């Protein structure tokens, strides 16, 4: 198992065309990754809650008719189940799944975070990932192949004031990923991936204007896409960093 291993692969690595499912695809890292993968000739399957944002993304994807974007809420088990059926029917079983959908609490001490806000972070960041695993891993098992990337965070390996719910959710992702890695068949891989510090809406909610000092999602996506596309069964159980 690799702990917090940085990836330094070449951006021009040539890999076979893949079908990649990305949750939370309509903005931030998910959107940037989708655009980069499509540009490289891979098929993107994506989900998000906003149909308006999905429509906008569809028009920007290279070879836009090859991709499938669906409205779904990962917090809802039934929504993910329905999405899985639709994806298998229209595109088959994804080669790679990137569990990217996530949210963060407004900067607050834990005793100032409402129960509703705490639940929303956990339901999205932890239960949302579990829902995807529940419905897609059984589809991958018979093929004895498939890569699952669960987006973690530096705050899933450390702690920070004012974002305790988010930290807890990402620590959960680290543990969930390591445990599930021991449950899948040989040939598959489940990893936790710390994307690094990127200038997204989520970061802005924590850092304010200082978020603009960090790299943009599209620059990050070039490195992240190469890393994700080159993951193998040998990476199973890894705790990785872009």
Swiss-Prot record:
Binding-site residues, substrate: 153
Tissues where the protein occurs: Mostly expressed in seeds, and, to a lower extent, in roots, leaves, flowers and siliques.
Gene3D superfamilies: NAD(P)-binding Rossmann-like Domain
Active site: 166 (proton acceptor)
InterPro entries given in the database record: NAD(P)-bd_dom_sf, NADPH_pterin_aldehyde_rdct, Sc_DH/Rdtase_CS, SDR_fam
Its job: NADPH-dependent pterin aldehyde reductase involved in pterin aldehyde salvage during folate turnover. Catalyzes the reduction of diverse aromatic and aliphatic aldehydes (e.g. acetaldehyde, n-propanal, 1-naphthaldehyde, benzaldehyde, cinnamaldehyde, n-butanal, n-hexanal, n-pentanal, 2-naphthaldehyde, n-octanal, n-nonanal and n-heptanal), in addition to the conversion of pterin-6-aldehyde (PtCHO) to 6-hydroxymethylpterin (PtCH(2)OH), and the conversion of dihydropterin-6-aldehyde (H(2)PtCHO) to 6-hydroxymethyldihydropterin (H(2)PtCH(2)OH). Cannot reduce the pterin ring.
Annotated family: Belongs to the short-chain dehydrogenases/reductases (SDR) family.
Name of the protein this chain belongs to: NADPH-dependent pterin aldehyde reductase
């Amino acid at each position: 198992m690799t702990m917090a291993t940085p990836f330094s692969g070449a951006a021009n690595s040539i890999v076979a065309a893949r079908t990649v499912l990305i949750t939370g695809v309509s903005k931030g890292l998910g959107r940037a990754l989708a655009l980069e993968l499509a540009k490289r000739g891979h098929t993107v399957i994506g989900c998000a809650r906003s149909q308006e944002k999905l429509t906008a993304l569809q028009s920007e994807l290279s070879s836009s008719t090859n991709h499938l974007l669906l409205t779904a809420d990962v917090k809802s088990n039934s929504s993910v189940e329905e999405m899985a059926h639709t994806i298998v029917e229209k595109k088959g079983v994804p080669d790679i799944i990137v569990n990217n959908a996530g949210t963060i609490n407004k900067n607050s001490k834990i005793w100032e975070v409402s129960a509703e806000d705490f639940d929303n972070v956990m339901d999205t960041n932890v239960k949302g990932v579990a829902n995807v695993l529940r419905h897609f891993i059984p589809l991958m098992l018979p093929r004895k192949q498939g890569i699952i990337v669960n987006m973690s965070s530096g705050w899933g390996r450390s702690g920070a004031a004012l974002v305790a719910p988010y930290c807890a959710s990402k620590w959960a992702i680290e543990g969930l990923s390591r445990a599930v890695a021991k449950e899948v068949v040989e040939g598959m891989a489940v990893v936790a991936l710390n994307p690094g510090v990127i200038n997204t809406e989520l970061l802005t909610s924590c850092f304010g204007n200082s978020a603009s000092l960090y790299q943009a999602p599209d620059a990050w996506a070039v490195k992240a896409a190469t890393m994700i596309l080159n993951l193998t069964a040998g990476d199973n159980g890894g705790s990785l960093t872009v």
